[in-house]
Amino acid sequence: MAGIAMKLAKDREAAEGLGSHERAIKYLNQDYETLRNECLEAGALFQDPSFPALPSSLGFKELGPYSSKTRGIEWKRPTEICADPQFIIGGATRTDICQGALGDCWLLAAIASLTLNEEILARVVPLDQSFQENYAGIFHFQFWQYGEWVEVVVDDRLPTKDGELLFVHSAEGSEFWSALLEKAYAKINGCYEALSGGATTEGFEDFTGGIAEWYELRKPPPNLFKIIQKALEKGSLLGCSIDITSAADSEAVTYQKLVKGHAYSVTGAEEVESSGSLQKLIRIRNPWGQVEWTGKWNDNCPSWNTVDPEVRANLTERQEDGEFWMSFSDFLRHYSRLEICNLTPDTLTCDSYKKWKLTKMDGNWRRGSTAGGCRNYPNTFWMNPQYLIKLEEEDEDDEDGERGCTFLVGLIQKHRRRQRKMGEDMHTIGFGIYEVPEELTGQTNIHLSKNFFLTTRARERSDTFINLREVLNRFKLPPGEYVLVPSTFEPHKNGDFCIRVFSEKKADYQTVDDEIEANIEEIEANEEDIGDGFRRLFAQLAGEDAEISAFELQTILRRVLAKREDIKSDGFSIETCKIMVDMLDEDGSGKLGLKEFYILWTKIQKYQKIYREIDVDRSGTMNSYEMRKALEEAGFKLPCQLHQVIVARFADDELIIDFDNFVRCLVRLEILFKIFKQLDPENTGTIQLDLISWLSFSVL
């Protein structure tokens, strides 16, 4: 219940703008300005209690408390490491980012790319920090985390060994913005060791809030040049690199003056007419050096003489050192990998860019209710969360000769690095996209059934199921309605996720789920209509007071269920019996009279029939995944969120819902629906309660 309340509160805060870059969420409720001012007033340097200078902040295994790698480590402030520490000198450069004893080169490559864009760098690394003015041993940074900007505060105690920084450091040893940025990122992920191993695109996204895709240039898609042009039009960040095969290859220069293992940026893509034919050209920037391409279409290449002088002047006008043109074919031949970080509309301040349309949806997989696994598990796959995508407008131009709607889908699993300390790691995740059949178009209140997925193939799917934080793919489909189904590879895996869809044109996205509905069968009974046989049974069971209490009801039902071989049950708990009495006790006596007991008896027989029919394997019990169908048979349609609550409340560790819990669930639902209907006679879908009423209903 606490989790539901937290989600509701968070949704309300997000609607008010909390989590935007301008109103970043304070991680662990630590406010930078408040903490710094407190330290300055006290004349003390900040010590972060939430990420202490202790072995627990380093790691849990290779960097754990008893590891040889962590012996002799001392935590020191920059003022103790060098005579004149600086936060940042003359802007950020790649020499500020040298890898240490941590396998987070993926993160450092993303930081290096971040330095190519001063505006975006300043969002992540506030540049007005220093070791001189108002220095209090405290620094702050901003990261994008699953749709929200989060401000993280750290103290400046850094792990050292033999007087040297253990992890990332600057080449000169006196600049500390990158080391403190790495520490803040380690904090939000639980510890330094949690950063070991990852994809550069993960860092790209956490520094920009964008959605990052990458291409192996040995196997490029046929429309890659057009993809690059469109990405540049939309203000995306594009980076490329040449793979290295050994440590000796790092920073090695090829005979045509390209540097291996080096982060380049792509800044232009143009088609020019040369000697009667069209040439595709790519403009590359080497941001940290004068080393430039000497192959065809370099600055001094005679090929430029075959181009219209005005076009040539336009393209070769030098913006800054380190920028050069090369043919697209040479680009594919010499470079290994291209990464595109598509930025969100709020990141781009320039109105000249053609901005992506962005939608984000949050969801979760919960064991026993919405963690159905992939298509290999047909009995549970349909239980996964489902999202409707309505593609309405085609792209303005067909980049590959095919009309359609271009969109990117990114499925991110949340907080998995943080859980490495607890022995957890990334789930293997992926998704499928299904075309909505004509008879269901326009409906969002129907969770697609098991039979639909047994008879319908996916129209598109993620390239693979993989244990990375994000699975991302680019698609182009005709206008229409589609359902996206995210899943873990295996069922029964708990996890939170967010889905982001970037589309060229406006599209509509929403959760596909059953609407809340209760068709409760009202059993009409008059005492005169009750047969003599049932009257004699009631008189025998009720005793002299002609009423049945919850305790008497428990004894009666235990005897009844003991005779049934098709339902495994130890009888009903006293809690279940009490709420059954509460449901029908119209006179407030706390007991059931003849008519009330007759209605309850009829209901229990109906519950038995449903339970037996849903139990297809004749085990005498019900699996939690069968509960959804059982609730529908009983007249209740509920969204995924409520199924998660029901399974958490009524299923055991093996995801079994016994007959007692099944009945208790149905009775509680019936009571709650009836209360709501009484308090909402106009069917507005909303009621108001004071505290005493809320508490009275909550203890049911």
UniProtKB/Swiss-Prot annotation:
Classification via PROSITE patterns: CALPAIN_CAT, EF_HAND_1, EF_HAND_2, THIOL_PROTEASE_CYS
Main location: cytoplasm
Propeptide intervals in chain numbering: 2-19
One Gene Ontology term, aspect cellular component: nucleus
Protein residues bound to Ca(2+) 4: 292, 299, 319, 323
TM ranges: none
GO biological process, one term: protein catabolic process
Key words, A-Z: Acetylation, Calcium, Cell membrane, Cytoplasm, Hydrolase, Membrane, Metal-binding, Protease, Repeat, Thiol protease
Activity regulation as described: Activated by 200-1000 micromolar concentrations of calcium and inhibited by calpastatin.
CDD domains reported in the protein's UniProt record: Calpain_III, CysPc, EFh_PEF_CAPN2
Consequence of changing residue 226 to S: 12% decrease in activity
Calpain catalytic domain segment(s): 45-344
Residues annotated as binding Ca(2+) 1: 658, 661
Catalytic residues of the enzyme: 105, 262, 286
Chain residue ranges for the region called Linker: 515-529
Entry keyword annotation includes Calcium: yes
Descriptive protein name: Calpain-2 catalytic subunit
Organism (species): Rattus norvegicus
